[in-house]
Amino acid sequence: MAKEKFERNKPHCNIGTIGHVDHGKTSLTAAITKVLAETGGATYSAYDQIDKAPEEKARGITISTAHVEYQTEARHYAHVDCPGHADYVKNMITGAAQMDGAILVVSAADGPMPQTREHILLARQVGVPALVVFMNKVDQVDDPELLELVEMEIRELLSSYDFPGDDIPIVKGSALAALEDSNKEIGHDAILELMKAVDAYIPQPERPKNLPFLMPIEDVFSISGRGTVVTGRIERGVVKVGEEIEIVGIKPTVKTTCTGVEMFRKLLDQGEAGDNVGVLLRGTKREDVERGQVLCAPGSITPHTEFEAEAYILTKEEGGRHTPFFTNYRPQFYFRTTDVTGVVTLPEGTEMVMPGDNVKMNVTLIAPIAMEEKLRFAIREGGRTVGAGVVSKVLK
Protein backbone atom coordinates (compact mmCIF):
# COMPACT_ATOMS: atom_id res chain seq x y z
CA MET A 1 0.00 0.00 0.00
CA ALA A 2 1.39 3.41 -0.96
CA LYS A 3 2.06 5.69 1.98
CA GLU A 4 -0.55 8.38 2.46
CA LYS A 5 0.59 11.96 2.24
CA PHE A 6 0.61 13.67 5.64
CA GLU A 7 -2.56 15.75 5.70
CA ARG A 8 -2.33 19.09 7.44
CA ASN A 9 -6.04 19.76 6.99
CA LYS A 10 -7.17 17.87 10.09
CA PRO A 11 -7.22 19.60 13.46
CA HIS A 12 -4.12 18.72 15.52
CA CYS A 13 -4.18 17.58 19.15
CA ASN A 14 -1.37 16.66 21.58
CA ILE A 15 -2.01 13.76 23.93
CA GLY A 16 -0.09 11.27 26.04
CA THR A 17 -0.44 8.14 28.12
CA ILE A 18 -0.18 8.47 31.92
CA GLY A 19 -0.59 5.99 34.78
CA HIS A 20 1.20 3.59 37.14
CA VAL A 21 4.34 1.69 36.16
CA ASP A 22 3.61 -1.61 34.34
CA HIS A 23 -0.10 -0.88 33.87
CA GLY A 24 0.47 -0.91 30.10
CA LYS A 25 1.03 2.68 28.92
CA THR A 26 3.64 1.75 26.32
CA SER A 27 1.77 -1.39 25.18
CA LEU A 28 -1.33 0.76 24.69
CA THR A 29 0.65 3.33 22.69
CA ALA A 30 1.94 0.52 20.45
CA ALA A 31 -1.55 -0.99 20.17
CA ILE A 32 -3.06 2.33 19.03
CA THR A 33 -0.51 2.62 16.22
CA LYS A 34 -1.08 -1.02 15.23
CA VAL A 35 -4.87 -0.75 15.04
CA LEU A 36 -4.86 2.64 13.28
CA ALA A 37 -2.22 1.42 10.80
CA GLU A 38 -4.88 -0.90 9.30
CA THR A 39 -6.74 2.11 7.92
CA GLY A 40 -3.57 4.02 7.02
CA GLY A 41 -3.89 6.37 9.99
CA ALA A 42 -0.53 5.44 11.49
CA THR A 43 2.71 3.57 11.05
CA TYR A 44 2.92 0.70 13.52
CA SER A 45 5.52 1.35 16.25
CA ALA A 46 6.38 -1.80 18.20
CA TYR A 47 6.73 -1.77 22.00
CA ASP A 48 10.56 -1.93 21.90
CA GLN A 49 10.78 1.03 19.52
CA ILE A 50 8.71 3.19 21.88
CA ASP A 51 10.37 1.90 25.04
CA LYS A 52 13.84 3.05 23.91
CA ALA A 53 12.84 6.67 24.24
CA PRO A 54 15.51 9.21 23.27
CA GLU A 55 16.62 11.79 25.82
CA GLU A 56 15.72 15.42 25.25
CA LYS A 57 16.53 18.59 27.09
CA ALA A 58 13.75 20.94 28.17
CA ARG A 59 14.53 23.99 30.34
CA GLY A 60 17.90 22.49 31.19
CA ILE A 61 16.39 19.19 32.31
CA THR A 62 16.99 15.87 30.58
CA ILE A 63 13.81 13.90 29.91
CA SER A 64 13.26 10.65 28.04
CA THR A 65 10.12 10.81 25.91
CA ALA A 66 8.88 8.78 22.99
CA HIS A 67 6.79 10.53 20.35
CA VAL A 68 4.43 8.75 17.96
CA GLU A 69 1.89 10.26 15.61
CA TYR A 70 -1.32 8.89 14.19
CA GLN A 71 -4.68 10.05 12.89
CA THR A 72 -8.31 9.13 13.30
CA GLU A 73 -11.14 10.21 10.99
CA ALA A 74 -11.49 13.36 13.07
CA ARG A 75 -8.01 14.51 14.09
CA HIS A 76 -4.27 14.23 13.79
CA TYR A 77 -2.52 13.33 17.06
CA ALA A 78 0.97 13.70 18.46
CA HIS A 79 1.25 11.22 21.33
CA VAL A 80 3.92 11.15 24.06
CA ASP A 81 4.87 8.18 26.19
CA CYS A 82 7.59 8.20 28.86
CA PRO A 83 9.60 5.19 30.03
CA GLY A 84 9.90 6.07 33.72
CA HIS A 85 7.82 7.73 36.42
CA ALA A 86 10.41 10.50 36.92
CA ASP A 87 10.21 11.31 33.20
CA TYR A 88 6.44 11.79 33.51
CA VAL A 89 6.82 14.13 36.45
CA LYS A 90 9.46 16.20 34.63
CA ASN A 91 7.53 16.14 31.36
CA MET A 92 4.28 17.35 32.86
CA ILE A 93 5.88 20.04 34.99
CA THR A 94 8.18 21.49 32.31
CA GLY A 95 5.47 21.20 29.66
CA ALA A 96 8.19 19.76 27.39
CA ALA A 97 5.45 17.83 25.65
CA GLN A 98 2.33 19.94 25.83
CA MET A 99 -0.74 17.80 26.59
CA ASP A 100 -4.19 18.90 25.40
CA GLY A 101 -5.53 15.74 27.01
CA ALA A 102 -4.30 12.41 28.34
CA ILE A 103 -5.21 8.72 28.36
CA LEU A 104 -4.98 7.40 31.92
CA VAL A 105 -4.08 3.71 31.83
CA VAL A 106 -5.18 1.61 34.82
CA SER A 107 -4.67 -2.13 35.14
CA ALA A 108 -7.97 -3.88 35.88
CA ALA A 109 -6.01 -6.46 37.89
CA ASP A 110 -4.44 -3.88 40.25
CA GLY A 111 -6.85 -0.97 40.21
CA PRO A 112 -5.55 2.55 40.96
CA MET A 113 -2.02 2.57 42.45
CA PRO A 114 0.19 5.33 43.95
CA GLN A 115 1.43 6.66 40.60
CA THR A 116 -2.12 6.57 39.20
CA ARG A 117 -3.01 9.01 41.96
CA GLU A 118 0.13 11.08 41.46
CA HIS A 119 -0.35 11.40 37.70
CA ILE A 120 -3.99 12.49 38.16
CA LEU A 121 -2.86 15.10 40.71
CA LEU A 122 -0.11 16.30 38.35
CA ALA A 123 -2.57 16.49 35.46
CA ARG A 124 -4.78 18.67 37.68
CA GLN A 125 -1.90 20.87 38.89
CA VAL A 126 -0.35 21.47 35.46
CA GLY A 127 -3.73 22.04 33.80
CA VAL A 128 -4.28 19.05 31.50
CA PRO A 129 -7.83 19.90 30.35
CA ALA A 130 -9.34 16.41 29.97
CA LEU A 131 -8.67 12.73 30.66
CA VAL A 132 -10.01 9.52 29.13
CA VAL A 133 -9.43 6.20 30.93
CA PHE A 134 -8.32 2.91 29.42
CA MET A 135 -8.87 0.04 31.85
CA ASN A 136 -6.23 -2.40 30.63
CA LYS A 137 -5.63 -6.14 31.23
CA VAL A 138 -9.34 -6.95 31.61
CA ASP A 139 -8.54 -10.51 30.45
CA GLN A 140 -6.77 -11.02 33.80
CA VAL A 141 -10.00 -10.46 35.74
CA ASP A 142 -12.68 -13.18 35.63
CA ASP A 143 -15.25 -11.51 37.85
CA PRO A 144 -17.32 -8.76 36.16
CA GLU A 145 -18.23 -7.36 39.60
CA LEU A 146 -14.55 -6.78 40.26
CA LEU A 147 -14.30 -4.75 37.03
CA GLU A 148 -17.22 -2.62 38.20
CA LEU A 149 -15.53 -2.04 41.54
CA VAL A 150 -12.30 -0.94 39.86
CA GLU A 151 -14.29 1.41 37.61
CA MET A 152 -16.04 2.95 40.63
CA GLU A 153 -12.70 3.35 42.37
CA ILE A 154 -11.21 5.14 39.34
CA ARG A 155 -14.22 7.47 39.06
CA GLU A 156 -14.05 8.36 42.77
CA LEU A 157 -10.32 9.02 42.52
CA LEU A 158 -10.82 11.31 39.49
CA SER A 159 -13.60 13.21 41.28
CA SER A 160 -11.43 13.67 44.37
CA TYR A 161 -8.97 15.62 42.17
CA ASP A 162 -11.71 17.79 40.63
CA PHE A 163 -12.00 15.90 37.34
CA PRO A 164 -15.59 15.03 36.32
CA GLY A 165 -15.33 11.41 37.49
CA ASP A 166 -18.93 10.54 36.60
CA ASP A 167 -18.62 11.74 32.99
CA ILE A 168 -15.12 10.63 32.00
CA PRO A 169 -15.25 7.80 29.45
CA ILE A 170 -13.73 4.54 30.74
CA VAL A 171 -12.96 2.02 28.00
CA LYS A 172 -12.20 -1.57 29.04
CA GLY A 173 -9.83 -3.72 27.02
CA SER A 174 -6.44 -5.32 26.61
CA ALA A 175 -3.55 -3.67 24.79
CA LEU A 176 -1.80 -7.05 24.60
CA ALA A 177 -4.81 -8.69 22.95
CA ALA A 178 -4.69 -5.95 20.30
CA LEU A 179 -0.95 -6.45 19.78
CA GLU A 180 -1.24 -10.24 19.59
CA ASP A 181 -4.53 -10.30 17.63
CA SER A 182 -5.81 -12.75 20.24
CA ASN A 183 -9.25 -11.43 21.23
CA LYS A 184 -10.81 -8.96 18.78
CA GLU A 185 -13.46 -7.68 21.17
CA ILE A 186 -11.18 -6.60 24.04
CA GLY A 187 -8.22 -5.92 21.72
CA HIS A 188 -8.79 -4.35 18.31
CA ASP A 189 -12.38 -3.18 18.99
CA ALA A 190 -11.55 -1.71 22.42
CA ILE A 191 -8.73 0.37 20.89
CA LEU A 192 -11.11 1.77 18.26
CA GLU A 193 -13.66 2.52 20.98
CA LEU A 194 -10.95 4.28 23.01
CA MET A 195 -9.97 6.46 20.04
CA LYS A 196 -13.64 7.36 19.47
CA ALA A 197 -13.81 8.45 23.12
CA VAL A 198 -10.61 10.50 22.75
CA ASP A 199 -11.96 12.16 19.57
CA ALA A 200 -15.25 13.01 21.25
CA TYR A 201 -14.23 13.82 24.81
CA ILE A 202 -10.90 15.66 24.60
CA PRO A 203 -11.73 19.21 23.46
CA GLN A 204 -9.97 20.65 20.43
CA PRO A 205 -7.44 23.22 21.71
CA GLU A 206 -7.75 26.79 20.49
CA ARG A 207 -5.02 27.62 17.94
CA PRO A 208 -2.39 29.99 19.40
CA LYS A 209 -3.20 32.56 16.71
CA ASN A 210 -6.81 32.87 17.93
CA LEU A 211 -5.89 33.66 21.54
CA PRO A 212 -5.31 37.19 22.93
CA PHE A 213 -1.98 38.73 21.83
CA LEU A 214 1.07 38.12 24.04
CA MET A 215 4.77 38.68 23.35
CA PRO A 216 7.53 38.30 25.96
CA ILE A 217 10.00 41.18 25.55
CA GLU A 218 13.55 40.01 24.86
CA ASP A 219 15.26 43.25 23.89
CA VAL A 220 14.63 47.00 23.72
CA PHE A 221 16.16 49.45 21.22
CA SER A 222 15.86 53.14 20.64
CA ILE A 223 15.73 54.17 16.98
CA SER A 224 16.33 57.88 16.51
CA GLY A 225 13.41 59.64 14.88
CA ARG A 226 11.19 56.56 15.16
CA GLY A 227 10.97 55.73 18.83
CA THR A 228 11.34 52.57 20.86
CA VAL A 229 11.35 49.07 19.39
CA VAL A 230 10.91 45.92 21.47
CA THR A 231 11.77 42.51 20.04
CA GLY A 232 10.61 39.00 20.86
CA ARG A 233 8.72 35.98 19.61
CA ILE A 234 4.95 36.31 19.60
CA GLU A 235 3.63 33.57 21.87
CA ARG A 236 -0.01 33.84 20.87
CA GLY A 237 -2.51 36.00 19.05
CA VAL A 238 -1.97 38.74 16.50
CA VAL A 239 -0.75 42.33 16.80
CA LYS A 240 -1.80 44.85 14.15
CA VAL A 241 -0.31 48.25 13.40
CA GLY A 242 -2.42 50.96 15.05
CA GLU A 243 -3.70 48.72 17.85
CA GLU A 244 -3.58 49.65 21.51
CA ILE A 245 -1.48 47.24 23.59
CA GLU A 246 -0.29 46.99 27.19
CA ILE A 247 3.16 46.55 28.70
CA VAL A 248 2.78 44.30 31.75
CA GLY A 249 5.10 43.08 34.51
CA ILE A 250 7.91 44.34 36.77
CA LYS A 251 6.68 47.98 36.64
CA PRO A 252 3.14 49.39 36.75
CA THR A 253 1.13 48.43 33.66
CA VAL A 254 1.09 51.04 30.88
CA LYS A 255 -0.87 51.36 27.66
CA THR A 256 0.80 52.20 24.36
CA THR A 257 0.09 51.88 20.64
CA CYS A 258 1.82 49.63 18.15
CA THR A 259 2.96 51.93 15.32
CA GLY A 260 4.91 49.34 13.35
CA VAL A 261 5.74 45.64 13.10
CA GLU A 262 8.97 44.53 11.51
CA MET A 263 10.24 41.05 10.65
CA PHE A 264 13.58 40.31 8.91
CA ARG A 265 13.91 44.08 8.24
CA LYS A 266 10.59 44.17 6.37
CA LEU A 267 7.58 46.16 7.55
CA LEU A 268 4.38 44.18 8.12
CA ASP A 269 0.76 45.12 8.80
CA GLN A 270 0.64 42.56 11.58
CA GLY A 271 2.66 39.94 13.45
CA GLU A 272 1.19 36.62 14.57
CA ALA A 273 1.90 33.68 16.90
CA GLY A 274 5.31 32.16 16.13
CA ASP A 275 6.79 35.26 14.45
CA ASN A 276 10.03 36.81 15.70
CA VAL A 277 9.31 40.52 15.39
CA GLY A 278 10.25 44.02 16.37
CA VAL A 279 7.29 46.11 17.56
CA LEU A 280 7.52 49.89 17.41
CA LEU A 281 5.82 51.60 20.36
CA ARG A 282 4.35 55.12 20.25
CA GLY A 283 5.55 57.60 22.86
CA THR A 284 7.34 54.99 24.94
CA LYS A 285 10.85 55.81 26.21
CA ARG A 286 13.56 53.18 26.09
CA GLU A 287 13.91 53.26 29.88
CA ASP A 288 10.17 52.59 30.36
CA VAL A 289 10.45 49.05 28.98
CA GLU A 290 12.68 46.12 29.91
CA ARG A 291 13.34 42.50 29.19
CA GLY A 292 11.02 40.30 31.28
CA GLN A 293 7.93 42.39 30.64
CA VAL A 294 5.34 41.34 28.07
CA LEU A 295 3.38 43.14 25.37
CA CYS A 296 -0.23 42.01 25.35
CA ALA A 297 -3.81 42.69 24.35
CA PRO A 298 -5.21 45.13 26.96
CA GLY A 299 -6.66 43.36 30.00
CA SER A 300 -5.69 39.88 28.79
CA ILE A 301 -3.04 39.19 31.45
CA THR A 302 -2.26 40.84 34.78
CA PRO A 303 0.86 41.20 36.96
CA HIS A 304 1.16 39.08 40.12
CA THR A 305 3.69 38.35 42.86
CA GLU A 306 2.16 35.41 44.74
CA PHE A 307 1.30 32.01 43.36
CA GLU A 308 1.03 28.33 44.14
CA ALA A 309 3.21 26.05 42.02
CA GLU A 310 4.05 22.45 41.34
CA ALA A 311 7.81 22.06 40.93
CA TYR A 312 10.39 19.39 40.20
CA ILE A 313 13.79 19.79 41.87
CA LEU A 314 16.78 18.45 39.93
CA THR A 315 19.00 15.72 41.34
CA LYS A 316 22.72 16.25 41.85
CA GLU A 317 23.33 14.01 38.78
CA GLU A 318 21.10 16.29 36.69
CA GLY A 319 23.25 19.26 37.67
CA GLY A 320 20.96 20.39 40.47
CA ARG A 321 21.47 21.04 44.18
CA HIS A 322 23.42 18.63 46.36
CA THR A 323 21.45 19.46 49.50
CA PRO A 324 17.78 19.84 50.46
CA PHE A 325 16.08 23.23 50.89
CA PHE A 326 13.57 24.46 53.47
CA THR A 327 10.83 27.08 53.83
CA ASN A 328 12.20 30.61 53.12
CA TYR A 329 14.49 29.30 50.36
CA ARG A 330 15.25 32.29 48.06
CA PRO A 331 16.24 31.29 44.51
CA GLN A 332 15.52 33.11 41.24
CA PHE A 333 12.43 32.23 39.22
CA TYR A 334 13.03 32.48 35.49
CA PHE A 335 9.78 33.47 33.75
CA ARG A 336 9.87 33.70 29.92
CA THR A 337 12.91 35.96 29.52
CA THR A 338 14.08 37.04 32.98
CA ASP A 339 14.96 36.04 36.54
CA VAL A 340 13.00 37.38 39.53
CA THR A 341 13.96 36.54 43.11
CA GLY A 342 11.25 34.86 45.16
CA VAL A 343 10.70 33.34 48.59
CA VAL A 344 9.41 29.77 48.88
CA THR A 345 6.91 28.65 51.52
CA LEU A 346 6.47 24.89 51.81
CA PRO A 347 3.06 23.39 52.63
CA GLU A 348 2.34 22.23 56.17
CA GLY A 349 3.79 18.80 56.76
CA THR A 350 6.60 19.27 54.23
CA GLU A 351 9.71 19.80 56.33
CA MET A 352 12.20 20.01 53.46
CA VAL A 353 12.60 19.25 49.76
CA MET A 354 15.26 16.83 48.54
CA PRO A 355 16.88 16.93 45.09
CA GLY A 356 14.76 14.67 42.83
CA ASP A 357 11.47 15.51 44.62
CA ASN A 358 8.41 17.08 43.10
CA VAL A 359 6.61 19.41 45.44
CA LYS A 360 3.72 21.83 45.78
CA MET A 361 4.85 25.21 47.08
CA ASN A 362 3.87 28.85 47.45
CA VAL A 363 6.12 31.58 46.07
CA THR A 364 6.24 35.32 46.72
CA LEU A 365 8.22 37.29 44.11
CA ILE A 366 9.98 40.59 44.82
CA ALA A 367 8.60 42.07 41.55
CA PRO A 368 5.35 41.34 39.69
CA ILE A 369 5.32 39.18 36.55
CA ALA A 370 2.58 38.89 33.89
CA MET A 371 1.15 35.63 35.14
CA GLU A 372 -1.60 33.09 34.55
CA GLU A 373 -2.22 29.46 35.40
CA LYS A 374 -0.14 26.91 33.43
CA LEU A 375 2.75 29.39 33.03
CA ARG A 376 6.07 27.49 33.19
CA PHE A 377 9.24 28.71 34.90
CA ALA A 378 12.73 27.53 35.84
CA ILE A 379 14.16 27.74 39.36
CA ARG A 380 17.74 29.00 39.24
CA GLU A 381 20.64 29.77 41.55
CA GLY A 382 23.12 32.18 39.99
CA GLY A 383 22.18 31.25 36.45
CA ARG A 384 22.23 27.48 37.08
CA THR A 385 18.93 25.63 36.71
CA VAL A 386 18.04 23.69 39.86
CA GLY A 387 14.38 23.01 39.15
CA ALA A 388 11.35 23.57 36.97
CA GLY A 389 7.81 24.51 37.82
CA VAL A 390 4.38 25.48 36.66
CA VAL A 391 1.93 28.00 38.14
CA SER A 392 -1.04 25.99 39.39
CA LYS A 393 -2.86 28.91 41.02
CA VAL A 394 -2.41 32.68 41.04
CA LEU A 395 -2.86 33.99 44.60
CA LYS A 396 -2.14 37.75 44.52
Swiss-Prot record:
What are this entry's molecular-function GO terms?
Answer: GTP binding; GTPase activity; guanosine tetraphosphate binding; translation elongation factor activity
**Binding, GTP:** 19-26, 81-85, 136-139
Q: Where in the cell is it found?
A: Cytoplasm
Region G2: list its residue ranges: 60-64
Ranges for region G4:
136-139
- Residues covered by region (G3): 81-84
Annotated spans, G1: 19-26
Domain of life, per the record? Bacteria
**Does the keyword field hold Heme?**
no
Catalysis performed (reactions): GTP + H2O = GDP + phosphate + H(+)
| A Gene Ontology cellular-component term | cytosol
Q: Which UniProt keywords apply?
A: Cytoplasm, Elongation factor, GTP-binding, Hydrolase, Magnesium, Metal-binding, Nucleotide-binding, Protein biosynthesis
**Xref: InterPro entries:** EF-Tu_GTP-bd, EF-Tu_GTPase, EFTu-like_2, EFTU_2, G_TR_CS, P-loop_NTPase, Small_GTP-bd, T_Tr_GTP-bd_dom
Q: Where is this region: G5?
A: 174-176
User: According to the UniProt entry, what is the EC number of this protein?
Assistant: 3.6.5.3
Q: Which ranges carry the tr-type G domain?
A: 10-206
- Statement: the UniProt record of this protein carries the keyword RNA-binding: no
Known NCBIfam families for this protein?
Answer: EF-Tu, PRK00049.1, PRK12735.1, PRK12736.1, small_GTP
Q: Which family does it belong to?
A: Belongs to the TRAFAC class translation factor GTPase superfamily. Classic translation factor GTPase family. EF-Tu/EF-1A subfamily.
Summary of the function given for this chain in its UniProt record: GTP hydrolase that promotes the GTP-dependent binding of aminoacyl-tRNA to the A-site of ribosomes during protein biosynthesis.
Complex and partners: Monomer.
Q: Please identify the protein, giving its name as recorded.
A: Elongation factor Tu
Give the species.
Parvibaculum lavamentivorans (strain DS-1 / DSM 13023 / NCIMB 13966)
Q: Taxonomic classification, please?
A: Bacteria, Pseudomonadati, Pseudomonadota, Alphaproteobacteria, Hyphomicrobiales
